[in-house]
């Protein structure tokens, strides 16, 4: 299983590290995403909240939306982590896919974290590339 760790701070929506665009192939069906959520560089409290992860194509077509598991540990090493383990729905199409993490609190207020990109290469290339020659 491939594991990608992605950090998001809702106080700094423009900060997007370059490492946030994992590259996988359609063969990769066991992919785990760990999102570490912060607010002002501190773990944010998700008490009573639900977290949803949506994947969209470049054409803004929603591939699917799913609820994620929330792991919150505010003890010695404070961390708020959202975990999602993918299945074949994510890698059924090749191309650039955008992941959007939405937090919905107990009052229904929605917070969207900055999106991340995911490059999915096809199973087999239809045309020869320079590597093939």
Model-derived features: where do they sit?
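N-terminal assembly/attachment segments of tailed bacteriophage virion structural proteins
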Residues: 1-128
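Compositionally biased low-complexity segments at domain edges in trafficked proteins
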Residues: 129-133
């Amino acid at each position: 299983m491939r594991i990608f760790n992605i950090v998001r701070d809702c106080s700094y929506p423009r900060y997007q590290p370059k490492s946030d665009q994992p590259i996988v192939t359609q063969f990769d069906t066991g992919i785990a995403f760990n999102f570490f959520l912060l607010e002002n560089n501190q773990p944010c409290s998700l008490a009573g909240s639900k977290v949803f992860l949506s994947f969209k194509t470049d054409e803004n077509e929603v591939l699917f939306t799913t609820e994620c598991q929330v792991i919150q540990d505010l003890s010695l090493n404070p961390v708020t982590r959202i975990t999602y383990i993918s299945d074949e729905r994510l890698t059924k199409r090749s191309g650039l896919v955008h992941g959007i993490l939405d937090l919905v609190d107990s009052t229904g207020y929605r917070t969207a974290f900055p999106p991340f990109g995911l490059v999915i290469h096809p199973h087999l290339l239809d045309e020869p590339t320079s590597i093939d020659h």
